[in-house]
Design a protein with these regions (language model features):
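Hydrophobic residues embedded in beta-strands of well-ordered beta-sheets
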Residues: 264-266, 286-287
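Short active-site loop at a secondary-structure junction
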Residues: 1-64, 112-121, 206, 288-289
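Short, gly/Ser/Thr-rich active-site loops of penicillin-recognizing serine hydrolases
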Residues: 262, 297-328
Length: 328
């Protein structure tokens, strides 16, 4: 494993997508209080509006998508990673693209009134990816690279592939934990595959969890959105402060999981089959990142173990760490 090797970011991708939305707002192409659906919504296409049965969809705003407050729930499973079941339920011969999937999901009732609850939602960030395409007139990946990643000095970040054959030349391999069993391929082929290579169609996760890159470039990206002077920020101070404003009642920050203002780090986590990722941005301006290429049976609980491990390392070694800016 080398520092420049590419690894899947999983839901750390959401932070990248959120920065793309904030960039569009700074470009005056979008407002966070804009409605997403309806006759005057961003995604006002007739095919979407004709699918809506629950009128509360018309109240969903961009900011509610960013904060996981748009009314979506996962009681019937995560719709973005349940492609095989959606294909069977809707008698589809091929996996649905984003417009087809959204048209299907809009027929469902919301789990709660937008803005009056919260539920972590991959669907919300898939929709944000579609909004970026609609407002920019560009493919999601192309817009993000041109206006977000390249200005941040990140030139080797890409939408990841699903299978081992899709692996980039400098990308790691992914492994399942001991005792894991094969699963049915996402496209309803009936084939059994290793979960990290075929359970989920990664490009369809898009801005919810599909980015890959190196930990070195990810750390540079974080440095470009932290509001500090050592690396030039790609967003305004106002946008960064808005994204990282501490939320009451443990609500989600924009892009980040949580951004407490006490003596605790900003947190962004991610988890996929074959991947666990965590980014911690501490008040002393240190950024600690861990991305694995192997699954753990602990799932999301692995992030809590990692945070505790980081704290032990910081207490034991931080005083003797070299005071060197690695971005110079």
């Amino acid at each position: 494993m080398e520092p420049n090797m590419l690894m899947r970011f999983a839901s750390v991708s959401k932070l990248i997508t959120a920065v793309g939305i904030m960039k569009l707002q700074e470009m005056k192409k979008l407002k966070l209080n804009e409605k997403v659906f309806g006759e005057k919504g961003i995604l006002r296409d007739t095919v979407y509006n004709n699918s809506i049965k629950d009128k509360r969809y018309y109240d969903i705003t961009v900011e509610q998508l960013l904060r996981h407050q748009a009314g979506f729930n996962n009681y019937a499973g995560d719709p973005v990673s349940s492609t095989r079941y959606i294909m069977m339920q809707n008698h589809l011969k091929t996996p649905p693209d984003h417009p087809t999937l959204l048209k299907i999901l809009l027929k469902r009732h919301l789990g709660y009134t937008p803005g009056e609850g919260k539920c972590y939602s991959n669907l919300g960030y898939m929709i944000l990816s579609m909004i970026i395409e609609k407002k920019s007139g560009m493919k999601y990946e192309n817009f993000m690279q041109k206006y977000v990643l390249h200005p941040a000095g990140c030139y080797d970040m890409h939408i990841a592939g699903t299978y081992l054959k899709d692996r980039r030349p400098n990308e790691t391999k992914y492994y399942m934990h001991q005792g894991s069993i094969p699963v049915y391929e996402y496209n309803n082929s009936g084939r059994l595959v290793e979960k990290c290579y075929g359970d989920t169609d990664l490009p369809r996760l898009s801005g919810a969890g599909a980015w890959c890159g190196s930990t070195a470039e990810l750390s540079r990206f974080i440095a470009s959105i932290d509001g500090l002077p050592h690396v030039k920020d790609i967003l305004s101070k106002k946008s960064i402060e808005f994204m990282t404003r501490e939320q009451t009642d443990h609500q989600y920050s924009i892009g980040w999981n949580y951004t407490p203002k006490s003596n605790k780090p900003w947190i962004r986590t991610g988890s996929l089959a074959g991947t666990s990722a965590i980014v911690l941005k501490y008040p002393d301006n240190q950024c600690w990142i861990l991305i694995t290429n192997t699954s753990t049976w602990k799932g999301h609980g692995f992030s809590n173990d990692t945070m505790a491990f980081f704290e032990k390392l910081r207490k034991k070694y931080m005083a003797n760490m070299p005071k060197k800016d690695l971005f110079l």
